[in-house]
C-alpha cells in the first residue's frame, strides 16, 4: 500500500513537471521574461507559505520527517508543486533532494494514519518517491540502506518494488524510454 502511494506521488511529480515545462514555455516563450516574472511569483508564494518552509532543497522537511518534528498534511504536496513550478521556469538542479523531501514528508503524514513508525515510513517515502520519479529500482534501495541503515532493507525493497511497478515508464532525469 505504501509503495503504491509513494509510486503515485513520484509519477505525479514526473508528470506535472513534464506538463508544466511545456505549459510555462508556451505561455512565456522568452526565457528571460519567464525567469523574471516567474521568480517574482515564486518568491511571493514562498514567503506567503510558512515564510520559506518550502524554499531550498527540502532538507528541513527531511530532518523534521525522520526526526519526529512537525510535518503538516500538505507539506509534501506544497513542496512538490513549488518544486515543479521552480523547475518549469527554467531553473536547473534541485530535483533529487526535493524528491527525498516530498517522499519523507508524505511518509510522515501516512505513518500515523496507518499506525506505523514515522521514521520507518518517512524513510520508505524518501527512497520510493525518488525511485518512482526516476524509474529506478535498485539504486533507491541502496540509498535507503546507506542513509538509514540495513535494518529495514526488506521493507525498502518491498515498497520500492511496488513504487517501481506502477511507474508507467515516466522518468524525471532522462528522456529516452525505459528499456522495460
Indicate where each model-derived feature is located.
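A conserved active-site cap/scaffold subdomain adjacent to cofactor or substrate pockets
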Residues: 6-13, 17
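Conserved small/polar residues in nucleotide/adenosyl-binding loops
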Residues: 174-179
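Alpha-helical transmembrane segments of multi-pass membrane proteins
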Residues: 76-81, 116-129, 141
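Membrane-spanning helices that line or support transport/gating and their immediate boundary helices
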Residues: 15-23, 140, 161, 165
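Loop-to-transmembrane alpha-helix initiation sites
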Residues: 119, 149-159
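Helix-loop-helix hairpins and the membrane-proximal interhelical loops
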Residues: 19-108
